[in-house]
């Protein structure tokens, strides 16, 4: 319940720009968010595994 309230609060534009911070678009996680994709590392990994992120594949060497 608290996370939903935070996501709702985050969706509005803040009074001051410095108060804005990145959150995952899918789960709302505030840490480890990849700015280029707008998702956290966990959701990014799931999306990459499913093949939903074009041009991204697992590294292997």
Curated annotation (Swiss-Prot):
Keyword Transcription regulation recorded: no
Q: How is the cofactor bound?
A: Binds 1 zinc ion per subunit.
Which GO biological-process labels does this protein carry? translation
Keywords, comma-separated and alphabetical? Metal-binding, Ribonucleoprotein, Ribosomal protein, RNA-binding, rRNA-binding, Zinc
| Gene Ontology CC | cytoplasm; small ribosomal subunit
A single MF term (Gene Ontology): zinc ion binding
Top-rank taxon, per record? Bacteria
Pfam families attached to this UniProt entry: Ribosomal_S14
Answer whether the UniProt record assigns the keyword Lipoprotein to this protein.
no
Q: Where do the annotations place Zn(2+) binding?
A: 24, 27, 40, 43
Kindly list the cofactors needed.
Zn(2+)
Q: Which InterPro entries does the entry mention?
A: Ribosomal_uS14, Ribosomal_uS14_bact, Ribosomal_uS14_sf
Main role?
Binds 16S rRNA, required for the assembly of 30S particles and may also be responsible for determining the conformation of the 16S rRNA at the A site.
Its quaternary structure? Answer: Part of the 30S ribosomal subunit. Contacts proteins S3 and S10.
Q: State the family named in the UniProt similarity comment for this chain.
A: Belongs to the universal ribosomal protein uS14 family. Zinc-binding uS14 subfamily.
Designated name of the protein:
Small ribosomal subunit protein uS14
Q: Tell me the organism.
A: Clostridium botulinum (strain Eklund 17B / Type B)
């Amino acid at each position: 319940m608290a996370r939903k309230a935070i996501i709702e609060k985050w969706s509005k534009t803040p009074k001051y720009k410095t108060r804005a911070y990145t959150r995952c678009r899918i789960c709302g996680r505030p840490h480890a968010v990849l700015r280029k994709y707008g998702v956290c590392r966990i959701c990014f990994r799931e999306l990459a595994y499913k093949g939903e992120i074009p041009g991204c594949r697992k590294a292997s060497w």
